[in-house]
A protein has these predicted regions:
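Active-site acidic-Proline motif in GNAT/NAT acetyltransferases
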Residues: 59
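Hot-dog-fold acyl-thioester-processing enzymes
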Residues: 1-49, 108-110, 114-121
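HotDog/MaoC-like acyl-thioester-processing domains
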Residues: 62-63, 72-121
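Short alpha-helix capping/helix-loop boundary micro-motifs
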Residues: 52-56
Length: 121
């Protein structure tokens, strides 16, 4: 099956909580972006997100982090695709403008989602 990966810097403007924490919806939004590319590559259409299942928030995401978000198609129906998602922190912002590459990336969020695409013509 197909996998697509995006990397994204988390801007400080997205921090909503003490310790520069970013809400979990940020990663879910990135899952939508990477799912869109999956649909374009497979079907030539952006598709629509139908549902999420088994969303797990495993580690914090903070402003200044760099996330690697991957979508892997695990099932293809006639008009639906089941996709496994992971959001991994690969760099962590530190004080000021400093940041460091993590020796061991941290899995922050996992989920399974279903997208639907138009019927083939």
């Amino acid at each position: 099956m197909i996998s697509v990966t995006h990397r994204r810097y988390v801007p400080y403007s997205h921090a909503h909580y003490a310790g520069h924490l970013v809400d979990g919806a940020y990663s879910l939004g990135l899952f939508g972006d990477v799912a869109t590319e999956v649909c374009i590559r497979l079907d030539g259409d952006e598709g629509l997100f139908a549902s999420y299942s088994d969303v797990q928030f495993k580690a914090p995401v903070r402003a200044g982090d760099v996330l690697e978000v991957t979508a892997t198609v695990t099932r293809m129906g006639t008009r639906s695709r089941t996709i496994d998602f992971t959001s991994v922190v690969v760099c962590r912002g530190t004080d000021g403008s400093a940041a460091s590459v993590l020796d061991e990336p941290s899995v922050a969020v996992t989920a399974t989602g279903t997208v639907v695409v138009p019927p083939r013509r």
